[in-house]
Amino acid sequence: MIIRHLSENIINQIAAGEVIERPANVVKELVENAIDAEATRIEIVTTNGGKNFIRVSDNGCGIPADQLTLAVSRHCTSKITDDVHNICFLGFRGEALPSIGSVAKLKLTSRTQNAESAAEIIVTAGKIVGPKPAAANPGTIVEVRDLFFVTPARLKFMKTDRAETNSITDMIKRIAIAFPHIHFSLSGSDRTSLELPATANNTQGQLQRITQIMGKEFAPNSIVLNAERESVRLTGFACLPSFNRSNSLHQFAYVNGRPVRDKFLWGAIRGAYADVMTRDRYPVSILFIDLPPADVDVNVHPTKADVRFRDPGFIRGLIVGAIREALHHTGVRSTSTRSEAMLAAFQTQKPLKTFKSTYKPSSYSPQPYHVESASMVNKPLDIISPVGLKEDAPPLMEGLDIPSGDAYTPNTPAASEECSYPLGAARAQIHKNYIIAQTQDSLIIVDQHAAHERLVYEALKNALYSKPLPSQLLLIPEIVELSEEDATCLLTHKDALQKFGLGIEAFGPGAIVVRETPSLLGEINVEALIKDLADEAAEYDTTDNLKTMLDYVAATMACHGSIRSGRLLHPEEMNALLRQIEATPNTGTCNHGRPTYIELKLADIERLFGRK
């Protein structure tokens, strides 16, 4: 077999296969070139999902007529010279235009801001014609026709026109979020599908642009991020855990303004939400990471979608710390989306049919619910046990450094102050699972199981950094058979598990004896618990992942040790639960990311009844 030089055209087609996989890649490369040219308005037109026609026009600085030939030649660029480690532009390789021209019909028309006329050049399957004079406004227009007509086999891998159009739209949205000061317009054969007017290039402008793309529900459910450590700055928005999605399509990350889809960053975001969201849900977040160009390598993938950080551990720590700190300082807050959904669910009922009433007055006169004093509203939750209602049950949070409701004791009678708490005063319990509370201007519905599950979980986590949880000695220690590897792995975490109140010891090869279990959990299936913990320990058998494992252990214990649905609560218990929710961090959601409560404003209730 003879080794030979490939022709320039074949080389370009091979390069195009790496850079241009589908129409969305063409649009991405052309839009990035327009942004690098300092355009403030970019218009995109496509037909048939970009397979037949793509046009990207901008009002940027333009390309001089004598440089058009270089613009469509490989490895010719104005953005870098010899320093490939200090890249400040979105594009830099000089591959996009020649790659497109080698597999499609390309026409490039451009005019600089000071030129009297424009010029155009045409590239068809790698063959260049021009440049020649043309008529156009200052800026650049790139038209691409019959994509992959040179390699028709590639067309078989294209998706439907609708799917390709959706891919282009998603890509434009991701770029537009990072550049709110640029006007973006995307249209198809017969209509404009996306119109994003320019906004201010600041945090408020970014939020306005994000609202244009994500919808009006994003802003009230988001938290502003602003953290800086050494030479790295993290800004953006992290949404409440209860405002989540079933996939990662609503996670956006930008490194020095470049949109990226990097698994490392997705993992850092999931790590930040690990103990407030279930594993099968994805948080909504938008992160902007700005750091010196020399500290990140953007030249690791042909499409520049992946990046490599010089110190990935530092970046992960910054992301996780900033998001968790922001969530911690949100206080008692849950998503507003479900409240809006509840409002939408109410429909004006049709008038009831007239019927002859058989009602007879009753002598019964119901007594209104009334709390005797503020101390009752603020009474600690001291009779809730994980295994049932017991008169002599110890306080739920006894021995743990969890803030109690005592800090909220008012000095005035409860009649005037009971509704001033963030979650108000309990008025009723319905279906033995939902607490109805009243504030000064709203109605609160609390899921007692979800709320108490979060309280127990936070108490368990708190035990890791303070005194251990109380435990109960088993009358007959239980022996659990495991594989020798699992037993050894679990025993390495013996001290950490002891803080949870779980006492284990080795009992020969491949066996563990359990002598103590957490008092908080009551009666449990010890064998099932140990085997689950062994699986968690095997999955996270590193020092870095120990905390993750312990968080999952705490979450599992909390779910089994919290108030169950169907449990009847007294008014004192309900009010004490509300006070503990207010005094405990991260109580807007349970361990699985579900909301612990929803709020319905009085104005919304009045609107439902036509009063406003």
From Swiss-Prot:
One of its GO terms (cellular component) is mismatch repair complex. InterPro entries: DNA_mismatch_repair_CS, DNA_mismatch_repair_MutL, DNA_mismatch_S5_2-like, HATPase_C_sf, MutL/Mlh/PMS, MutL/Mlh/Pms-like, MutL_C, MutL_C_dimsub. Keywords: DNA damage, DNA repair. Gene3D superfamilies: 3.30.230.10, Histidine kinase-like ATPase, C-terminal domain, MutL, C-terminal domain, dimerisation subdomain, MutL, C-terminal domain, regulatory subdomain. Signal peptide: none annotated. One of its GO terms (molecular function) is ATP-dependent DNA damage sensor activity. CDD domains: HATPase_MutL-MLH-PMS-like, MutL_Trans. GO terms for biological process: mismatch repair. This protein is involved in the repair of mismatches in DNA. It is required for dam-dependent methyl-directed DNA mismatch repair. May act as a 'molecular matchmaker', a protein that promotes the formation of a stable complex between two or more DNA-binding proteins in an ATP-dependent manner without itself being part of a final effector complex. HAMAP family: DNA_mis_repair. NCBIfam families: mutl, PRK00095.2-4. Belongs to the DNA mismatch repair MutL/HexB family. This is DNA mismatch repair protein MutL. It comes from Bartonella henselae (strain ATCC 49882 / DSM 28221 / CCUG 30454 / Houston 1) (Rochalimaea henselae).
